[in-house]
């Protein structure tokens, strides 16, 4: 779900934290991508002309494989070295949000069934998209595909976006890529958004610089996490009636969620806000401060040449993809991964800071030059 309104708050208070650019600007970069988020997007977006998902001859959905294969190739063609992180077991605290999602899926399926005799194709597709969920089998198929493509992946112990951030913090990758803004709660140096679908939708990639965001918001990590919880995250409900502007104002005035809760409880008559009963905000904060992740420094990432024959067996013979296109894709992978090895020029040079010269120094320098001319 992410954090409601956070993107706009950062744009407003820390505009220098934002950059927009194209895929080619990430040449030579290694990026950790939230695989679970990608697969969900592919199942929704990769469709036939009639709006239905891609399927094999046996009727099995293959939209997730098509998206993962071709969009990963586009990244590699642009000199990017992608790796993927898959979700592990969700934290207990996320159970409420997952239950809500399941209820929404059931409601969408029921509505789809109720209107199937009278609805237009567009309406049926809309309701079908609302019911999309990534299955365990689809996750496993995506992992098999990545292995055959020579692209590394990691199974996170818990949340994929937390593991992506951990890899970025450890210096194994340049950035974490996810649509979930709560990825910033794990303090990756950079968060990339729209990475895997920017070209398809003809939109730029957003990069958020964590350090500049904190400087602009004038917050430390824990205060920022408290802001995100107050805005609304996956781990607990928020205080009703508190929108982004009010949340930012309350955090600035009181400094922490603990102080906000205390203020509301001590002043019930002077505020319209009411703290949810047994509100687990402290537990949610702890999940962000100390996420369950595998240590990034212990993870070795290795990009290899694709296993072409096995790739053809899986994608063509088992899943019904075009052999010519799969073989062509494999060649692009080989070429792209070799090209990406060249790296970036800024990886070979360090930036040297130069102090600004004082006006007096400039005058002295000019004076000495004149003396020499004489």
From Swiss-Prot:
The keyword DNA repair applies. Interacts with PCNA. Three molecules of FEN1 bind to one PCNA trimer with each molecule binding to one PCNA monomer. PCNA stimulates the nuclease activity without altering cleavage specificity. Structure-specific nuclease with 5'-flap endonuclease and 5'-3' exonuclease activities involved in DNA replication and repair. During DNA replication, cleaves the 5'-overhanging flap structure that is generated by displacement synthesis when DNA polymerase encounters the 5'-end of a downstream Okazaki fragment. It enters the flap from the 5'-end and then tracks to cleave the flap base, leaving a nick for ligation. Also involved in the long patch base excision repair (LP-BER) pathway, by cleaving within the apurinic/apyrimidinic (AP) site-terminated flap. Phosphorylated. Phosphorylation upon DNA damage induces relocalization to the nuclear plasma. Residues 1-105 are annotated as: N-domain. DNA binds at residues 47, 71, 159, 232, 234. Residues 354-365 have a biased composition (Basic and acidic residues). It is found in: Nucleus, Nucleolus; Nucleus, Nucleoplasm; Mitochondrion. Residues 341-349 are annotated as: Interaction with PCNA. It is an enzyme of class 3 (hydrolase). One of its GO terms (molecular function) is 5'-flap endonuclease activity. Its EC number is 3.1.-.-. Its cofactor is Mg(2+). It holds the Pfam family XPG_N. It comes from Meyerozyma guilliermondii (strain ATCC 6260 / CBS 566 / DSM 6381 / JCM 1539 / NBRC 10279 / NRRL Y-324) (Yeast). Residues 123-254 are annotated as: I-domain. PANTHER family: FLAP ENDONUCLEASE 1, FLAP ENDONUCLEASE FAMILY MEMBER. SMART domains: HhH2, XPGI, XPGN. This is Flap endonuclease 1.
């Amino acid at each position: 779900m992410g954090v409601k309104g956070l993107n706009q708050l950062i744009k407003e208070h820390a505009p220098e934290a934002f950059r927009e650019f194209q895929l080619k600007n990430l040449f030579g970069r290694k990026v950790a991508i939230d695989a679970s988020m990608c697969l969900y997007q592919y199942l929704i977006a990769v469709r036939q002309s009639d709006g239905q998902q891609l399927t094999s001859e046996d009727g099995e959905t293959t939209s997730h494989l098509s998206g993962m294969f071709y969009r990963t190739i586009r990244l590699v063609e642009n000199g990017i070295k992608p790796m993927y992180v898959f979700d592990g077991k969700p934290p207990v605290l996320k159970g409420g949000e997952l239950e809500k999602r399941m209820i929404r899926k059931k409601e969408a399926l029921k509505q789809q069934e109720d209107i199937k005799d009278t609805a237009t194709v567009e309406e049926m597709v809309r309701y079908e998209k609302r019911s999309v969920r990534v299955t365990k089998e689809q996750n496993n198929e995506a992992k098999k595909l990545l292995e055959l493509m020579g692209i590394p992946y990691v199974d996170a112990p818990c949340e994929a976006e937390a593991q992506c951030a951990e890899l970025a913090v450890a210096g194994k990758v340049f950035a974490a890529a996810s649509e979930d803004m709560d990825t910033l709660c794990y303090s990756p140096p950079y968060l990339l958004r729209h990475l895997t679908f920017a070209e398809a939708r003809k939109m730029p990639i957003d990069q958020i610089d964590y350090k500049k965001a904190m400087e602009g918001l004038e917050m430390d990590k824990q205060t920022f996490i408290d802001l995100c919880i107050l805005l609304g995250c996956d781990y607990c409900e928020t205080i009703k009636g508190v929108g982004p502007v009010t949340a930012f104002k309350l955090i600035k005035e009181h400094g922490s969620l603990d102080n906000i809760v205390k203020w509301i409880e001590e002043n019930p008559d002077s505020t319209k806000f009411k703290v949810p009963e047994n509100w687990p905000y402290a537990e949610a904060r702890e999940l962000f401060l100390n996420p369950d992740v595998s240590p990034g420094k212990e993870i070795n990432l290795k990009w290899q040449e694709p296993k072409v024959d096995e790739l053809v067996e899986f994608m063509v013979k088992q899943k019904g993809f075009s052999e010519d296109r799969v073989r062509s894709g494999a060649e692009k992978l080989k070429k792209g991964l070799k090209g990406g090895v060249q790296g970036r020029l800024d990886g070979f040079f360090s930036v040297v800071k130069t102090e600004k010269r004082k006006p007096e120094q400039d005058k002295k320098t000019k004076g000495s030059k004149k003396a020499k001319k004489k």
